[in-house]
């Protein structure tokens, strides 16, 4: 082992010798040096922010050395050594340069080699501070280890395994000014500091010293700070500090000292700061500081045993004393404790057991700025306690047992800035308690039992007076959290113009109005009203912002209150929802994210942000006394402020007549009467008192069989008469409803409506007012073969022509037939003309011409379209048809309808007056209620006449046909149609419209005819391409001999057989003059071959 040790020391010596041969350099370590070291490969260097980190050996998970270098500032060497030979792994040729501080952590002492050799090896130049911290020294420290560290100013040596140090340890460190040794040292050598005449601070804390050698501090004339804390110096005497007259601060806390001699600090004549904390004092001697007239601060904190009191005049006559910190479970203090120490500025007596204070305690503290009496057991303070502390700015009295604040206690504290009296038992505050504290900025009175009420004043008067704080106009913070306050006082709003924070949380405030939130503070004010008992927040609809208003928002937190969500909070709800008057948004910003309703039951737990304003109601009556109630018996009456309505709810009350109703208050605008599910047979007169004010009448589920207009209140705007026994409504009632009802304000379903001619006014009303009738689609006719929805009917459906008309027509036809037979012989030579006349009277339909049938119609075509497709009508369809090669007369509702007429009547009239109806089918048409009604009218007209009169133009993509209206879907599946964009569009459209052509003569006059009825359908058939190949078989039809046709065309009757659809049954040709033709004229009428292509016509 001895040989191994010698070899190690020899190796280190070789390294040192090599190091001593290197030229010195003052260049600081930089990025280039770091890069070169990484290239070398023995160690790894990396820049980290403004530092460099070196790891040796390179890439090791647990490196032996980790160096952190801040050039020109510090070097930290972190060691992980198992033996002193590991120092050989330090990076070679490293030149760190000048640094101020070197710290070596967890490193071993380098054998018998100086620590300075390691610094030299690393190229560290001129350090002034060395910190050596390690619990693994490897050996005891000696003078040799500190050799060549003459330039050090500060040396800190920390270890836990060193109990003794040599007397000459510090002999070579003559320039040392600050020394710190923490090493569990049990004994201090008497000559340890003999050569340290420049030493200014000694830190020997956290050792195990039991005594100090006499005169050990006598050779250090510059010593200022002596820290001997956390040792075992139980028996200090004045001789321990002999020669230490230059010491200014001494710290002997945590030494287990139980008592001190009265003259222990006699030699410390210049001391300014003494720390006696954390000892075991049960008493202190009188005159302890009599020799220390330069005292500035004394600390006696956390005494380990109770120290009941302090000796009289302990801190008296200290001309420079400023700070006292006394926390030792003190129970009482002498009145002359600080006598004539007039420069004291800070006294901390918090966390003691004081119950009261002598009135003269602060008699001479005219310069006192801060006084801490918190966390004691004070129940009372003398009114004269602060009589002389006129410069006091900070007073802390929290966590005591004080019950009141008198009118004089703070009368001389005009400079007080902060007063904290939290967590006491305060109940009363004299109204003049803060008259003189007009400089107060922060007042904390939270967690007390303050209610601020004046017992001799009426409750209403108390809301109009100021609180005791009204004199503090410059107050910034007023903390009244967790008290018993029930009002927001006027002075908080109107006179505290600098207020920034008002905490009223956890109090007993039960209601708020606009005036309670109208703060005039010129700062951004935060008001905390959470956890009160606020049930009502009433804001007016309109407010006037006076001259005192400023633009600063008041932030009010209203969360966690038991709010009653009734009609009184309407404008508050509007403000929360953002639907508010502008003046509110400029004044308040409310926090309500946790505010929910506590009542009524239906809204319990609902966040106010989700409340709908129309659900907010209040009872009309607040008394249960029948003599005082205005609400009808068996009914519930509420006021709804949202629309200023009185709601009377008498539903399911087994009523047989409308009860007597209260008169509508002048502030109310509406009366809503609910009488659903009763047994009413009739309604009262509209002039009945109370009933005359009803604006919304709900009568569903009664037994009404009729309603007269004089039973409907004049101002009625909503009427629900569904599920009664009504069969009809007369025209006067419908006229009234037409004048007064609003959107979806009428309900008529569930009644057994009779859909006959008497129901025509009702049907027209439902068609004209489909937006007003909320249940229009559920109105059913009961007199049909099966229940039919009224919305699907037209006036022609419910009111067909009189039977008498048909009887008269039959009689006329019969008479006409008799007359024709009677005169047949007389007018034999005119038999052709007579047959034509009979044919014109529906006796010979194949000779009936279209123009003859439609000669009384004003228009060639009625155009049905959605108003959203109007550009197509105006820009294309109308110009092409009215001004094209064949000019047609069109009916367009924008131009040709009668002004003021019913829409359904205009539709029926337009269809009846037009030879064709053109349907411009699009998505807009499908969505249009009126457009679908126009189609339905045209379709039914065509069905009644047995003729095809509808031309469908598909203008745009209509989607899935299966999703269309049933009637329209069926029509499109069974009939042909045109598509906009077809190359033959205009030719096909003009061909499908009525034709007028000049033709031959009959008899003595010219007879102009259009195609036969059969050809009308054939023209429409040409809208879609015809099959290329004709059908292989002729459709079955009833063959009819037409002698008239035969005679007119020069053939025998049996040669001219016509099929009912207008086709020639023999050859599909007609042969005038013995020639066969595919098309031609018969009797002056143009006949079209229905199997011909369009190009053949």
UniProtKB/Swiss-Prot annotation:
The lineage of its organism: Eukaryota, Metazoa, Ecdysozoa, Arthropoda, Hexapoda. It holds the Pfam family LRRNT. One of its GO terms (biological process) is larval somatic muscle development. In early embryos, concentrated in the pseudocleavage furrows that form transiently between nuclei before cellularization and in the cleavage furrows during cellularization (at protein level). Later, found on cells in the mesectoderm, stomodeum, proctodeum, anterior and posterior midguts, splanchnopleura, salivary gland placode and adjacent to the segmentally repeated tracheal placodes (at protein level). During and after germ band shortening, localized in a number of cell types, including the salivary gland, foregut, hindgut, Malpighian tubules and epidermis (at protein level). Changing residue 513 to R: In strain: MelZim1, MelZim5 and MelZim6. Residues 1-27 form the signal peptide. This is Protein toll. It comes from Drosophila melanogaster (Fruit fly). Changing residue 592 to A: In strain: MelZim6. SUPFAM superfamilies: L domain-like, Toll/Interleukin receptor TIR domain. In the absence of ligand, forms a low-affinity disulfide-linked homodimer. Ligand binding induces conformational changes in the extracellular domain of Tl. This may enable a secondary homodimerization interface at the C-terminus of the Tl extracellular domain. It is found in: Cell membrane; Cytoplasm.
């Amino acid at each position: 082992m001895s040989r191994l040790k010698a070899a190690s020391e020899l190796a280190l010596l070789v390294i040192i010798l090599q190091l001593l041969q290197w030229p010195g350099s003052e260049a600081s370590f930089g990025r280039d040096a770091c890069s070169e070291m990484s290239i070398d490969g023995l160690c790894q260097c990396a820049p980290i922010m403004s530092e460099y980190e070196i790891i040796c050996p390179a890439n090791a998970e647990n490196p032996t050395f980790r160096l952190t270098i801040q050039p020109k500032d510090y070097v930290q060497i972190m060691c992980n050594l198992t033996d002193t030979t590991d120092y050989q792994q330090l990076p070679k040729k490293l030149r760190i340069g000048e640094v101020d501080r070197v710290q070596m952590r967890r490193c071993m002492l380098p054998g018998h080699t100086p620590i300075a050799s390691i610094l030299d090896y690393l190229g560290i130049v001129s350090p002034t501070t060395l910190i050596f911290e390690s619990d693994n020294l490897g050996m005891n420290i000696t003078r040799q280890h500190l050799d060549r560290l003459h330039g050090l100013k500060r040396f800190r040596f920390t270890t836990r395994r060193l109990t003794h140090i040599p007397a000459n340890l510090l002999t070579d460190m003559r320039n040392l000014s600050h020394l710190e040794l923490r090493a569990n040292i049990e004994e201090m050598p008497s000559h340890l500091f003999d050569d340290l005449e420049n030493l200014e601070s000694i830190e020997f804390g956290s050792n195990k010293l039991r005594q100090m050698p006499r005169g050990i501090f006598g050779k250090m004339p510059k010593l200022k700070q002596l820290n001997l804390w956390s040792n075992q110096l139980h028996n200090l005497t004045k001789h321990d500090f002999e020669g230490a007259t230059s010491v200014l601060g001494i710290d002997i806390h945590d030494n287990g000292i139980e008592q001190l001699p009265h003259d222990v600090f006699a030699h410390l004549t210049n001391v300014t700061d003494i720390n006696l904390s954390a000892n075991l004092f049960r008493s202190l001697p009188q005159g302890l500081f009599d020799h220390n007239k330069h005292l500035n601060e004394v600390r006696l904190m956390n005494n380990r045993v109770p120290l009941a009191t302090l000796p009289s005049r302990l801190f008296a006559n200290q001309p420079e004393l400023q700070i006292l910190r006394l926390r030792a479970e003190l129970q009482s203090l002498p009145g002359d404790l600080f006598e004539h120490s007039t420069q004291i500025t800070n006294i901390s007596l918090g966390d003691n057991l004081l119950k009261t204070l002598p009135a003269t305690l602060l008699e001479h503290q005219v310069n006192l700025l801060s006084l801490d009496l918190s966390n004691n057991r004070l129940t009372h303070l003398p009114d004269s306690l602060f009589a002389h502390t006129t410069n006091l700015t900070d007073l802390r009295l929290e966590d005591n047992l004080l019950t009141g604040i008198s009118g004089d206690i703070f009368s001389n504290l005009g400079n007080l800035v902060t007063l904290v009296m939290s967590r006491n038992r305060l109940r009363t505050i004299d109204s003049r308690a803060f008259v003189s504290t007009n400089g107060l900025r922060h007042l904390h009175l939270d967690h007390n039992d303050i209610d601020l009420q004046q017992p001799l004043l009426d409750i209403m008067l108390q809301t109009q007076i100021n609180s005791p704080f009204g004199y503090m106009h410059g107050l910034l913070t007023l903390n009244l959290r967790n008290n018993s306050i029930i009002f927001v006082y006027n002075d908080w709003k109107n006179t505290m113009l600098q207020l920034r924070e008002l905490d009223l949380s956890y109090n007993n405030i039960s209601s708020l109005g606009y005036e309670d939130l109208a703060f005039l503070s010129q700062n951004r004010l935060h008001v905390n009203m959470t956890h009160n008992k606020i049930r009502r927040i009433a804001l007016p609809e309109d407010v006037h912002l006076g001259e005192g208003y400023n633009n600063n928002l008041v932030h009010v937190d209203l969360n966690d209150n038991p709010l009653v969500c009734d009609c009184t909070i309407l404008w508050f709800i509007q403000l929360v929802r953002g639907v508010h008057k502008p003046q509110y948004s400029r004044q308040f910003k409310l926090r309500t994210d946790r505010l929910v309703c506590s009542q009524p039951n239906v809204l319990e737990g609902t966040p106010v942000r989700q409340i709908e304003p129309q659900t907010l109601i209040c009872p009309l009556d607040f008394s249960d006394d029948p003599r005082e109630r205005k609400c009808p018996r068996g009914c519930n009456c509420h006021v709804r402020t949202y629309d200023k309505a009185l709601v009377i709810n008498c539903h399911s009350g087994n009523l047989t007549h409308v009860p007597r109703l209260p008169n509508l208050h002048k502030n109310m605008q509406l009366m809503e009467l609910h009488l659903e599910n009763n047994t009413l047979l009739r309604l009262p007169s509209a002039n009945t008192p109370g009933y005359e004010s009803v604006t919304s009448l709900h009568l569903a589920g009664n037994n009404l069989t009729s309603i007269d207009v004089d039973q409907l209140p004049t101002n009625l705007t909503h009427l629900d008469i569904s599920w009664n026994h009504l069969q009809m409504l007369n025209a006067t009632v419908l006229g009234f409803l037409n004048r007064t009802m609003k959107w979806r304000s009428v309900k008529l379903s569930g009644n057994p409506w009779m859909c006959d001619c008497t129901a025509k006014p009702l049907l027209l009303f439902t068609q004209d007012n489909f937006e007003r009738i909320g249940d229009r689609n559920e109105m059913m006719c009961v007199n049909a073969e099966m229940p039919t929805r009224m919305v699907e009917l037209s006036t022609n459906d419910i009111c067909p022509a009189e039977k008498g008309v048909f009887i008269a027509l039959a009689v006329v036809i019969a008479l006409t037939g008799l007359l024709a037979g009677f005169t047949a012989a007389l007018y034999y030579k005119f038999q052709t003309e007579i047959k034509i006349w009979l044919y014109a009277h529906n006796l010979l339909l194949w000779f009936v011409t279209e123009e003859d049938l439609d000669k009384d119609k004003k228009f060639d075509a009625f155009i049905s379209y959605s108003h959203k497709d109007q550009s197509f009508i105006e820009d294309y369809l109308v110009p092409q048809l009215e001004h094209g090669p064949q000019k047609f007369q069109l009916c367009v509702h924008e131009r040709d309808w009668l002004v003021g007429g019913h829409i359904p009547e205009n539709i029926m009239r337009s269809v009846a007056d037009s030879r064709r109806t053109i349907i411009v089918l699009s998505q807009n048409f499908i969505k249009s209620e009126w457009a679908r009604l126009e189609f339905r009218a045209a379709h039914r007209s065509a069905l009644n006449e047995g003729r095809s009169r509808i031309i469908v133009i598909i203008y745009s993509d209509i989607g899935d046909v299966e999703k269309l209206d049933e009637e329209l879907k069926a029509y499109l599946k069974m009939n042909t149609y045109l598509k906009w964009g077809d190359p033959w569009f205009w030719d096909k459209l003009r061909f499908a419209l009525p034709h007028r052509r000049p033709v031959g003569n009959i008899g003595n006059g010219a007879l102009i005819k259009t195609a036969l009825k059969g050809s009308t359908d054939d023209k429409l058939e040409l809208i879609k391409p015809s099959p290329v190949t004709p059908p292989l078989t002729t459709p079955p039809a009833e063959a009819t001999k037409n002698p008239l046709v035969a005679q007119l065309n020069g053939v025998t009757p049996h040669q001219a057989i016509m099929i009912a659809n207008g086709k020639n049954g023999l050859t599909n040709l007609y042969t005038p003059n013995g020639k066969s033709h595919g098309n031609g004229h018969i009797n002056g009428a143009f006949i079209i071959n229905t199997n011909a292509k369009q190009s053949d016509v």
